[in-house]
Amino acid sequence: MDIIQAIVLGIIQGLTEFLPISSSAHLRIFPALLGWDDPGAAFTAIIQIGTLAAVLIYFYQDILRITSATISGLVNRNPFGSQDSRMGWMISAGTIPIVVLGLLFKKNIETTFRSLYIISGSLILLALVLMYAEYLVKKREARGEKMLSLDKVDWKEAIIIGLAQSLALIPGSSRSGTTITGGLFLGMTRETAARFSFLLSLPAVFAAGVYQLLKVWPELMASGDELVNLTVATVVSGVIGYASIAFLLDYLKKHSTYLFIIYRILLGVFLLAMLSMGKLEAF
Protein backbone atom coordinates (compact mmCIF):
# COMPACT_ATOMS: atom_id res chain seq x y z
CA MET A 1 0.00 0.00 0.00
CA ASP A 2 1.27 3.48 -0.85
CA ILE A 3 0.27 6.86 0.57
CA ILE A 4 -2.26 7.56 -2.22
CA GLN A 5 -4.03 4.27 -1.55
CA ALA A 6 -4.06 5.07 2.18
CA ILE A 7 -5.69 8.46 1.53
CA VAL A 8 -8.29 6.96 -0.82
CA LEU A 9 -9.16 4.21 1.67
CA GLY A 10 -9.38 6.79 4.46
CA ILE A 11 -11.83 8.83 2.39
CA ILE A 12 -13.89 5.73 1.62
CA GLN A 13 -13.99 4.75 5.31
CA GLY A 14 -15.00 8.26 6.39
CA LEU A 15 -17.72 8.55 3.75
CA THR A 16 -19.25 5.13 4.27
CA GLU A 17 -18.87 4.36 8.00
CA PHE A 18 -21.93 6.31 9.08
CA LEU A 19 -24.06 5.99 5.96
CA PRO A 20 -26.09 2.75 5.88
CA ILE A 21 -24.08 1.37 2.95
CA SER A 22 -21.28 -0.57 4.75
CA SER A 23 -17.77 0.80 5.07
CA SER A 24 -16.23 -2.68 5.34
CA ALA A 25 -17.87 -3.64 2.04
CA HIS A 26 -16.51 -0.57 0.27
CA LEU A 27 -13.03 -1.12 1.72
CA ARG A 28 -13.19 -4.61 0.22
CA ILE A 29 -14.85 -3.66 -3.08
CA PHE A 30 -12.88 -0.61 -4.20
CA PRO A 31 -9.42 -2.19 -3.86
CA ALA A 32 -10.74 -5.18 -5.85
CA LEU A 33 -12.05 -2.89 -8.61
CA LEU A 34 -8.82 -0.89 -8.69
CA GLY A 35 -6.59 -3.96 -8.70
CA TRP A 36 -5.19 -3.30 -5.22
CA ASP A 37 -4.60 -5.90 -2.54
CA ASP A 38 -7.38 -6.47 0.00
CA PRO A 39 -6.41 -4.23 2.96
CA GLY A 40 -7.78 -6.89 5.30
CA ALA A 41 -10.04 -6.98 8.34
CA ALA A 42 -7.29 -5.66 10.64
CA PHE A 43 -6.73 -2.52 8.53
CA THR A 44 -10.49 -1.95 8.36
CA ALA A 45 -10.87 -2.22 12.14
CA ILE A 46 -7.90 0.04 12.91
CA ILE A 47 -8.84 2.95 10.64
CA GLN A 48 -12.28 2.90 12.23
CA ILE A 49 -10.52 4.52 15.19
CA GLY A 50 -10.51 7.65 13.02
CA THR A 51 -14.26 7.58 12.58
CA LEU A 52 -14.58 6.72 16.27
CA ALA A 53 -12.77 9.99 17.02
CA ALA A 54 -15.28 11.76 14.77
CA VAL A 55 -18.15 10.41 16.92
CA LEU A 56 -16.35 11.43 20.12
CA ILE A 57 -15.85 14.98 18.86
CA TYR A 58 -19.32 15.37 17.34
CA PHE A 59 -21.15 14.01 20.39
CA TYR A 60 -18.65 15.06 23.05
CA GLN A 61 -21.26 16.85 25.17
CA ASP A 62 -23.60 13.85 25.16
CA ILE A 63 -20.72 11.46 25.85
CA LEU A 64 -19.35 13.51 28.76
CA ARG A 65 -22.82 13.81 30.24
CA ILE A 66 -23.61 10.10 29.88
CA THR A 67 -20.21 9.01 31.21
CA SER A 68 -20.38 11.37 34.19
CA ALA A 69 -23.93 10.31 35.05
CA THR A 70 -23.09 6.61 34.76
CA ILE A 71 -20.09 6.93 37.09
CA SER A 72 -22.05 9.09 39.54
CA GLY A 73 -24.86 6.54 39.53
CA LEU A 74 -22.45 3.76 40.46
CA VAL A 75 -20.77 5.83 43.19
CA ASN A 76 -24.14 6.81 44.65
CA ARG A 77 -25.48 3.25 44.30
CA ASN A 78 -28.28 4.47 42.09
CA PRO A 79 -27.16 3.36 38.60
CA PHE A 80 -30.49 4.20 36.93
CA GLY A 81 -31.17 7.42 38.78
CA SER A 82 -31.07 9.65 35.71
CA GLN A 83 -31.82 9.38 32.01
CA ASP A 84 -28.14 9.84 31.13
CA SER A 85 -26.99 7.08 33.48
CA ARG A 86 -29.67 4.77 32.04
CA MET A 87 -28.41 5.56 28.54
CA GLY A 88 -24.90 4.55 29.61
CA TRP A 89 -26.21 1.16 30.69
CA MET A 90 -28.32 0.78 27.56
CA ILE A 91 -25.23 1.37 25.40
CA SER A 92 -23.32 -1.20 27.47
CA ALA A 93 -26.13 -3.74 27.11
CA GLY A 94 -26.37 -3.14 23.37
CA THR A 95 -22.64 -3.77 23.00
CA ILE A 96 -22.70 -7.27 24.51
CA PRO A 97 -24.05 -9.15 21.44
CA ILE A 98 -21.40 -7.89 19.01
CA VAL A 99 -18.58 -8.60 21.49
CA VAL A 100 -19.74 -12.18 22.09
CA LEU A 101 -20.47 -12.95 18.43
CA GLY A 102 -17.33 -11.14 17.27
CA LEU A 103 -15.18 -13.43 19.42
CA LEU A 104 -17.11 -16.55 18.39
CA PHE A 105 -16.88 -15.85 14.65
CA LYS A 106 -13.51 -14.07 14.60
CA LYS A 107 -11.95 -16.46 12.06
CA ASN A 108 -14.92 -16.25 9.69
CA ILE A 109 -14.97 -12.44 9.91
CA GLU A 110 -11.34 -12.29 8.78
CA THR A 111 -11.71 -14.88 6.01
CA THR A 112 -15.01 -16.40 4.77
CA PHE A 113 -17.19 -13.34 5.36
CA ARG A 114 -14.94 -11.21 3.14
CA SER A 115 -16.11 -13.08 0.03
CA LEU A 116 -17.54 -10.65 -2.52
CA TYR A 117 -20.46 -13.04 -2.99
CA ILE A 118 -21.35 -12.70 0.69
CA ILE A 119 -20.84 -8.93 0.55
CA SER A 120 -23.10 -8.52 -2.49
CA GLY A 121 -25.78 -10.68 -0.89
CA SER A 122 -25.57 -8.70 2.35
CA LEU A 123 -25.89 -5.40 0.49
CA ILE A 124 -29.07 -6.51 -1.25
CA LEU A 125 -30.64 -8.36 1.69
CA LEU A 126 -30.21 -5.52 4.19
CA ALA A 127 -31.57 -3.09 1.59
CA LEU A 128 -34.77 -5.13 1.36
CA VAL A 129 -35.09 -5.34 5.16
CA LEU A 130 -34.49 -1.59 5.47
CA MET A 131 -37.11 -1.00 2.77
CA TYR A 132 -39.66 -2.93 4.85
CA ALA A 133 -38.68 -0.92 7.94
CA GLU A 134 -39.32 2.27 5.97
CA TYR A 135 -42.74 0.90 4.99
CA LEU A 136 -43.57 0.43 8.68
CA VAL A 137 -42.39 3.97 9.47
CA LYS A 138 -44.69 5.37 6.77
CA LYS A 139 -47.63 3.44 8.23
CA ARG A 140 -46.91 4.74 11.75
CA GLU A 141 -46.60 8.30 10.47
CA ALA A 142 -49.88 7.99 8.57
CA ARG A 143 -51.62 6.81 11.75
CA GLY A 144 -50.03 9.62 13.75
CA GLU A 145 -48.36 7.23 16.19
CA LYS A 146 -45.90 8.59 18.72
CA MET A 147 -42.35 7.53 17.87
CA LEU A 148 -39.91 6.01 20.37
CA SER A 149 -37.51 8.65 21.75
CA LEU A 150 -34.02 8.05 23.13
CA ASP A 151 -35.14 8.60 26.71
CA LYS A 152 -37.61 5.70 26.33
CA VAL A 153 -35.02 3.16 25.16
CA ASP A 154 -35.02 0.24 27.62
CA TRP A 155 -33.24 -3.10 27.99
CA LYS A 156 -35.36 -4.78 25.31
CA GLU A 157 -34.68 -2.10 22.70
CA ALA A 158 -30.98 -1.93 23.59
CA ILE A 159 -30.50 -5.69 23.24
CA ILE A 160 -32.50 -5.90 20.00
CA ILE A 161 -30.54 -3.06 18.40
CA GLY A 162 -27.35 -4.62 19.79
CA LEU A 163 -28.23 -7.89 18.07
CA ALA A 164 -28.87 -5.93 14.88
CA GLN A 165 -25.44 -4.33 15.25
CA SER A 166 -23.81 -7.76 15.47
CA LEU A 167 -25.02 -8.50 11.92
CA ALA A 168 -22.51 -5.87 10.79
CA LEU A 169 -19.77 -8.42 11.49
CA ILE A 170 -20.67 -9.58 7.98
CA PRO A 171 -19.21 -7.07 5.49
CA GLY A 172 -21.95 -5.56 3.36
CA SER A 173 -24.50 -5.44 6.16
CA SER A 174 -23.38 -2.03 7.53
CA ARG A 175 -23.21 -1.34 11.26
CA SER A 176 -25.17 1.90 10.92
CA GLY A 177 -27.50 0.21 8.44
CA THR A 178 -28.39 -2.69 10.75
CA THR A 179 -28.76 -0.53 13.87
CA ILE A 180 -30.82 2.16 12.13
CA THR A 181 -33.01 -0.60 10.67
CA GLY A 182 -33.42 -2.11 14.14
CA GLY A 183 -34.36 1.29 15.52
CA LEU A 184 -36.95 1.85 12.80
CA PHE A 185 -38.56 -1.54 13.49
CA LEU A 186 -38.83 -0.57 17.16
CA GLY A 187 -40.60 2.70 16.33
CA MET A 188 -37.79 5.26 16.43
CA THR A 189 -37.60 8.20 14.06
CA ARG A 190 -34.81 7.98 11.49
CA GLU A 191 -32.75 10.68 13.24
CA THR A 192 -33.20 9.08 16.68
CA ALA A 193 -32.20 5.68 15.31
CA ALA A 194 -29.08 7.22 13.76
CA ARG A 195 -28.12 9.00 17.00
CA PHE A 196 -28.43 5.83 19.06
CA SER A 197 -26.53 3.97 16.34
CA PHE A 198 -23.59 6.37 16.58
CA LEU A 199 -23.47 6.27 20.39
CA LEU A 200 -23.78 2.48 20.39
CA SER A 201 -20.82 2.21 18.01
CA LEU A 202 -18.32 3.67 20.50
CA PRO A 203 -17.48 0.66 22.71
CA ALA A 204 -17.45 -1.94 19.93
CA VAL A 205 -15.45 0.09 17.41
CA PHE A 206 -12.95 1.15 20.09
CA ALA A 207 -12.46 -2.43 21.30
CA ALA A 208 -12.07 -3.86 17.78
CA GLY A 209 -9.68 -1.11 16.70
CA VAL A 210 -7.43 -1.38 19.76
CA TYR A 211 -7.43 -5.19 19.59
CA GLN A 212 -6.33 -5.22 15.94
CA LEU A 213 -3.81 -2.41 16.52
CA LEU A 214 -2.12 -4.32 19.34
CA LYS A 215 -2.17 -7.45 17.21
CA VAL A 216 -0.29 -5.89 14.28
CA TRP A 217 1.79 -3.40 16.28
CA PRO A 218 5.08 -5.40 15.98
CA GLU A 219 4.68 -5.48 12.19
CA LEU A 220 3.95 -1.75 12.07
CA MET A 221 7.04 -1.01 14.13
CA ALA A 222 9.10 -3.06 11.69
CA SER A 223 7.73 -1.13 8.71
CA GLY A 224 7.74 2.65 8.99
CA ASP A 225 5.89 3.05 5.69
CA GLU A 226 2.98 0.88 6.81
CA LEU A 227 2.69 2.81 10.07
CA VAL A 228 2.61 6.12 8.16
CA ASN A 229 0.01 4.80 5.71
CA LEU A 230 -2.21 3.51 8.50
CA THR A 231 -1.92 6.78 10.41
CA VAL A 232 -2.78 8.84 7.33
CA ALA A 233 -5.78 6.65 6.49
CA THR A 234 -7.03 6.89 10.09
CA VAL A 235 -6.73 10.70 10.24
CA VAL A 236 -8.40 11.15 6.85
CA SER A 237 -11.25 8.83 7.84
CA GLY A 238 -11.83 10.88 10.99
CA VAL A 239 -12.04 14.22 9.17
CA ILE A 240 -14.35 12.90 6.45
CA GLY A 241 -16.33 10.91 9.02
CA TYR A 242 -17.17 14.03 11.04
CA ALA A 243 -18.69 15.65 7.95
CA SER A 244 -20.53 12.40 7.18
CA ILE A 245 -22.19 12.36 10.63
CA ALA A 246 -23.38 15.94 10.24
CA PHE A 247 -24.72 15.20 6.76
CA LEU A 248 -26.63 12.06 7.73
CA LEU A 249 -28.31 13.52 10.83
CA ASP A 250 -29.45 16.55 8.85
CA TYR A 251 -30.52 14.42 5.88
CA LEU A 252 -32.63 12.05 7.97
CA LYS A 253 -34.58 14.95 9.49
CA LYS A 254 -36.22 15.52 6.11
CA HIS A 255 -35.70 12.35 4.08
CA SER A 256 -36.11 8.58 4.22
CA THR A 257 -33.31 6.06 3.66
CA TYR A 258 -34.55 5.10 0.18
CA LEU A 259 -31.54 6.74 -1.50
CA PHE A 260 -29.25 4.35 0.38
CA ILE A 261 -31.56 1.40 -0.26
CA ILE A 262 -31.40 1.96 -4.02
CA TYR A 263 -27.62 2.42 -3.90
CA ARG A 264 -27.15 -0.82 -1.95
CA ILE A 265 -29.25 -2.82 -4.39
CA LEU A 266 -27.49 -1.37 -7.45
CA LEU A 267 -24.04 -1.99 -5.93
CA GLY A 268 -24.97 -5.54 -4.93
CA VAL A 269 -26.30 -6.36 -8.41
CA PHE A 270 -23.22 -4.77 -10.01
CA LEU A 271 -20.94 -6.91 -7.86
CA LEU A 272 -22.80 -10.09 -8.74
CA ALA A 273 -22.61 -9.21 -12.44
CA MET A 274 -18.86 -8.54 -12.24
CA LEU A 275 -18.32 -11.82 -10.38
CA SER A 276 -20.41 -13.84 -12.84
CA MET A 277 -18.46 -12.38 -15.80
CA GLY A 278 -15.16 -13.18 -14.12
CA LYS A 279 -14.17 -9.51 -13.86
CA LEU A 280 -13.73 -9.87 -10.10
CA GLU A 281 -12.64 -12.75 -7.88
CA ALA A 282 -14.60 -13.58 -4.73
CA PHE A 283 -11.43 -13.47 -2.59
From Swiss-Prot:
Cellular component per GO, a single term: plasma membrane
Single GO MF descriptor: undecaprenyl-diphosphatase activity
Disulfide-bond pairs as recorded: none
GO biological process: cell wall organization; peptidoglycan biosynthetic process; regulation of cell shape; response to antibiotic
Chain ranges passing through the membrane: 1-21, 40-60, 85-105, 117-137, 196-216, 232-252, 258-278
EC number(s) on file: 3.6.1.27
Function: Catalyzes the dephosphorylation of undecaprenyl diphosphate (UPP). Confers resistance to bacitracin.
Name recorded for this polypeptide: Undecaprenyl-diphosphatase
Record organism: Chloroherpeton thalassium (strain ATCC 35110 / GB-78)
